[in-house]
Amino acid sequence: MSVKSPFNVMSRNNLEAPPCKMTEPFNFEKNENKLPPHESLRSPGTLPNHPNFRLKSSENGNKKNNFLLCEQTKQYLASQEDNSVSSNPNGINGEVVGSKGDRKKLPAGNSVSPPSAESNSPPKEVNIKPGNNVRPAKSKKLNKLVENSLSISNPGLFTSLGPPLRSTTCHRCGLFGSLRCSQCKQTYYCSTACQRRDWSAHSIVCRPVQPNFHKLENKSSIETKDVEVNNKSDCPLGVTKEIAIWAERIMFSDLRSLQLKKTMEIKGTVTEFKHPGDFYVQLYSSEVLEYMNQLSASLKETYANVHEKDYIPVKGEVCIAKYTVDQTWNRAIIQNVDVQQKKAHVLYIDYGNEEIIPLNRIYHLNRNIDLFPPCAIKCFVANVIPAEGNWSSDCIKATKPLLMEQYCSIKIVDILEEEVVTFAVEVELPNSGKLLDHVLIEMGYGLKPSGQDSKKENADQSDPEDVGKMTTENNIVVDKSDLIPKVLTLNVGDEFCGVVAHIQTPEDFFCQQLQSGRKLAELQASLSKYCDQLPPRSDFYPAIGDICCAQFSEDDQWYRASVLAYASEESVLVGYVDYGNFEILSLMRLCPIIPKLLELPMQAIKCVLAGVKPSLGIWTPEAICLMKKLVQNKIITVKVVDKLENSSLVELIDKSETPHVSVSKVLLDAGFAVGEQSMVTDKPSDVKETSVPLGVEGKVNPLEWTWVELGVDQTVDVVVCVIYSPGEFYCHVLKEDALKKLNDLNKSLAEHCQQKLPNGFKAEIGQPCCAFFAGDGSWYRALVKEILPNGHVKVHFVDYGNIEEVTADELRMISSTFLNLPFQGIRCQLADIQSRNKHWSEEAITRFQMCVAGIKLQARVVEVTENGIGVELTDLSTCYPRIISDVLIDEHLVLKSASPHKDLPNDRLVNKHELQVHVQGLQATSSAEQWKTIELPVDKTIQANVLEIISPNLFYALPKGMPENQEKLCMLTAELLEYCNAPKSRPPYRPRIGDACCAKYTSDDFWYRAVVLGTSDTDVEVLYADYGNIETLPLCRVQPITSSHLALPFQIIRCSLEGLMELNGSSSQLIIMLLKNFMLNQNVMLSVKGITKNVHTVSVEKCSENGTVDVADKLVTFGLAKNITPQRQSALNTEKMYRMNCCCTELQKQVEKHEHILLFLLNNSTNQNKFIEMKKLLKS
């Protein structure tokens, strides 16, 4: 039942840190009291709008054990005076007439039911017969009993009888109802429909049960109340035993609640996945981790030597079940019981998987074990429904690998109180960061639900009149659509006097219009009056995005605010919609708002300063301080020059100064900003808006597009789509679902262009458009290349690379929505080759096409030029890797050119999602801080794990075994934590490849020493130098390291393969690929041959099924390197001499003879191309 964590936990870290932290903490129900001896009170969970109800306990049933006898009954009993035996020796409530010394006790819950009230005639006999040892009572004594104990005025009647049974009629319609409200457990209903209709009235009086277990422990419950009997034989067999068993049973509702709420963000691992509508997530937190360890140990100890016997559980009971796979005991809830087959269907509540097992592998849960909440929660993906009505098998196959046993972040959207509490969640995929519902919709497996976001189709829905409504403090029900604030509308060219209310940066600040100052002041007075009249409340939990009233912490005044996020269970991040600033507040400082207070539009206008960009890439504190000084407490003229997606591009001018002061110009003059390449100017008002196709914005904005980008030394899988020559061809990158997105885009584009829309498109060179391709009759994205004199247009199909001539009618205007996907056709050229003549020969083009057409290739980027990307193509589908350029060179179809790109340029083009690859291994140590690793003795052979391979001359390994200085490492971790968390101001830190740094590990948020393996604009890849873990972090999670923290040597070692020289510089990527396939993340044996500048020269051996394999010999065998070690060369010569003197000399001569014959046949064959590779092998 153990679940493998998807990430590498630092196994050698002595600090007992949980493997991960939850984004938002959650609390468990406190376990202050033990269960009562019987019929435990169900503790309420979260408080939904419509509490569900639970079946009434079967012990109570419909028994009527509290009643009064009418006069006819008294007379009837009196008339039986002469009959020798009373028909009920136990009496009305289990009391037997007899001597006091013979009295015993029997639980009243099993007393005999009285005669039916509907019967007109009294019964002649009662089912239960008296025991032999019970003496018949005399008539006088019985008459006295009746007069005394059945008298209405006799107080003993009320003390002897059990408490009245609560009516089980439906609170709304009056019919029989055995279901009760799970919150107050007092009101009964016949169906869910009646409960919903009654909720508006019942919610006023409904209060959660407040169990007092201390009192219950000292006071017998109704079902176990003792009454007196004469002898054990008076009690029906099995009654006492049955009560004892029920007293021991623990139901699912007895477990404590997780206290999860809507909008909370938690993290965990998906341990069971059936389909997107049914999967389980095992939560990760320090509490869960600690409990799982304690539970495992407790169950192992408690149930180690139990004897197998058939325990008969009941549905809904929490038991201990032995899992079939690993034979361990785990908590499970009983889903169903088949007594005849002696089997039960169980669900393991801490993992989510289920199975059918024999009853002899099930035991009741020991009451001494803590009633911790289930560690796995049942979930379904919110905001999406299956496209085909049910989740298809293809969908399950595609999505299960994305989630199963993956550590991911989920956000609770809704909570459904079903038989098992189910959570509607948004799941962020761990690898891509995308939301699962978006992925399902993009892949065509799901659809956006209409009318609801997160409810299942079969889930109970609220009444239509309740949808979209909420109750304010004064119990006035308002529609949520009335609580949406109005937004100020600004147009390009608008100019107004205002004040800057809040500044984050020059690209993120808020302005207020001065003309609305009086209305805003009146609003503040109304807010204060309204909020001061409201009593404090602790049950207000606004949803993210809701508008409410918030009490500002600095002046304790009330303002309108929007809930941005939940910082914890009791605090939220709010943004003040009239000012722009934000802060974290306690929920006690919030209250609901009314529509009247939302009549004034939100006054904070989000702005971006026009014409400037930060000179250093980010805005420095000095630049922000200067801007605040320029506009603080001043009336500023604000001019809107453009409208962005959710903000306005504005110019700020201080006209109170002479001459007028432009904030943008001051920032430029101070050197804090640089001017934008294309300054935004006022747009003409006479823009033509006619003949605009449907779906295209009437306002013509400049279209923006991007190409797929690759960085130098980046290696990707590609397929060639268009070929002009080895110096110009186009490729598709086979990455993730890019081609599927392209196909979907082409379908949408074709549907859009076939709608016979009015076409006002006028071709301009370099402009994107939709173009018709006559080859297959479809529409594709294109760029206008040339406008011909005959009116035709040459277009470049940007996703494929071909250039075609089309007519003006075969062009359409393109919408910006079709430009979101980067252009997929990448222009490439083979690196390090050139044509034999001025132009590429037909033979070279044909041969190149034969080598690459329809084949998945590996491309390594060698250079990036204006004419395309220079790549090295490798065919991995053959028996050995084949470099395409080498094939053309060997066949004398092209010439090899001297590559000017051996050394990597400093200004590499790097995609922001791709990391630079470290190639200059030995020279890449940090210039700022030199660091050292532990040094191993020469000639020592150790076992190690290879962590990362940069080249044959540099790879990192971690020796096996615990380090000797473990205590120092723990002290160092504490020092790093104090150093990195200390408040201080530092300039932006951008580490370089090979630098030593401090890195904050994702799983425990502790700081550790690390080595930089690669960098991008936003991320950095690091290797934790003392533990061997590798992960990619945002730049904010790395800090520079001090020399004092480098005094202790790193526990990893730097290695270089002994005595190898590459035969061909272009094959280095093949060597790295083979090395990674052979020994990356593998346990190998390292023999230290020497140490130079803290780099261990080693020979590497790996054990395989065929014996020990030397890695260097493997490379030499593949012809990718040659051995330059004198000792090894001498050994090879000795081996060759031995073979020359052995008895196989004659056989070797015969082999050489056959080789000559084979070469002769190949040289004289009609088709040279088919045998070139074979000739090459024979000549080598």
UniProtKB/Swiss-Prot annotation:
GO terms for molecular function: zinc ion binding. Zn(2+) 2 binds at C181, C184, H202, C206. It is found in: Cytoplasm. Testis and ovary specific. Also expressed in several cancers. Coiled coil: none annotated. Residues 312-372, 541-600, 762-821, 990-1048 form the Tudor domain. Its main location: cytoplasm. Keywords: Cytoplasm, Developmental protein, Differentiation, Meiosis, Metal-binding, Repeat, RNA-mediated gene silencing, Spermatogenesis, Zinc, Zinc-finger. Residues 27-41 have a biased composition (Basic and acidic residues). Gene3D superfamilies: 2.30.30.140, 2.40.50.90, 6.10.140.2220. Pfam families: TUDOR (PF00567), zf-MYND (PF01753). One of its GO terms (cellular component) is synapse. Found in a mRNP complex, at least composed of TDRD1, TDRD6, TDRD7 and DDX4. Interacts with MAEL. Interacts with PIWIL1, PIWIL2 and PIWIL4 (when methylated on arginine residues). Interacts with TDRD12. Tudor domains 2 and 3 have higher affinity for arginine-methylated peptides, tudor domain 1 is a poor binder due to an impaired aromatic cage. Belongs to the TDRD1 family. This is Tudor domain-containing protein 1. It comes from Homo sapiens. The lineage of its organism: Eukaryota, Metazoa, Chordata, Craniata, Vertebrata.
